[in-house]
Amino acid sequence: MQIKEQLRQLKPYQPGKPIEEVKMEYGLEKVVKLASNENPFGCSQAAKDALHQEIEQLALYPDGYSAALRTRLSEHLQVSESSIIFGNGSDELVQIICRSLLNDQANTITAAPTFPQYRHNAVIEGAEVREVPLRSDGAHDLDRMLEAIDGETKIIWVCNPNNPTGTYTSEQELIAFLNRVPEHILVVLDEAYYEYVTAEDYPESIPLLKQYPNVMILRTFSKAYGLAALRVGYGIADEALIRQIEPAREPFNTSRIGQASALAALDDQTFIQECVEKNKAGLKQYYDFAETHGLTCYPSQTNFVLIDFNRPADELFQALLEKGYIVRSGQALGFPTALRITVGTKEQNEEILTILAEIL
């Protein structure tokens, strides 16, 4: 068999060690995972209740149109139902977009470092990936991204807030950027951490869709909504664009349980606000720690923080792992002396920071 040449350039996704495996390997009774930016407070009770109500329907295929969730989400976002596309997590939407727009004659532009699935899926389609280094403040260098555009550019990815730095592009910066991007190029605003943002000058992106039909917004129920296991993401864009890329979407790509739980979670905004407030307090714990120990820390608009410890990240990762804390080493993220740490509960944050202080 002849596998695509570009697949030989890629490695399959390597998930972190399962919690149970870490317990067995290091003889631990408790392991805390602060590596994947999951919600440490779980999900809304309403989402759990909705999940249980769907259990009797598991023999039936889900609604391929996600009609009930689509209607409620369109009301929540104040957009038309036909301007929404659902994905098996927003990861699948990245795949759908690349499959729809890219080929071996095209190129796509991303920041570096940023969410790696943009590059991964573009390479599979045979496209050239043009990576533009982040600015010194960890944010996208939009001017240099504009300079990278040519006649074969099809997609520009703006991860906002950016993963792994947690930094963001302001509304003023974004609008100035969009005004200079040719209309035939799709600009994808990946807002996976949208609900956690507190910056006053963060873009209100949905109203921009009327002026910029070449913009698509990606969001997810995996982060603040705490439904990572159920894989429900969505995209918002001009109705014509959604119609054009819908054929690349699998027919039943979101489950009955996922749709029902996401709908219920959407209606519990009190839970989201509580999580956002706890996250703000948690971020302050990390900021204070970084200041006390003279460490560099990017201000974050997400539920994670990237701290530069000025020593090999893999060594710190291993030291924490042996103590029962799983974080993300910056080695594979483009920051070889930093750790990306998910903001946990107050107690989890205190525990890991105590361990880090001892190591330092």
Swiss-Prot record:
Stored SUPFAM superfamilies: PLP-dependent transferases
Record keywords: Amino-acid biosynthesis, Aminotransferase, Histidine biosynthesis, Pyridoxal phosphate, Transferase
An individual GO BP term: L-histidine biosynthetic process
InterPro entries per record: Aminotrans_II_pyridoxalP_BS, Aminotransferase_I/II_large, HisP_aminotrans, HistidinolP_aminotransfase, PyrdxlP-dep_Trfase, PyrdxlP-dep_Trfase_major, PyrdxlP-dep_Trfase_small
EC class (word): transferase
Catalytic function, reaction form: L-histidinol phosphate + 2-oxoglutarate = 3-(imidazol-4-yl)-2-oxopropyl phosphate + L-glutamate
Record PTM N6-(pyridoxal phosphate)lysine, positions in chain: 223
Keyword Transferase: yes
Entry GO MF terms: histidinol-phosphate transaminase activity; pyridoxal phosphate binding
Oligomeric form and interacting partners: Homodimer.
Name of this protein: Histidinol-phosphate aminotransferase
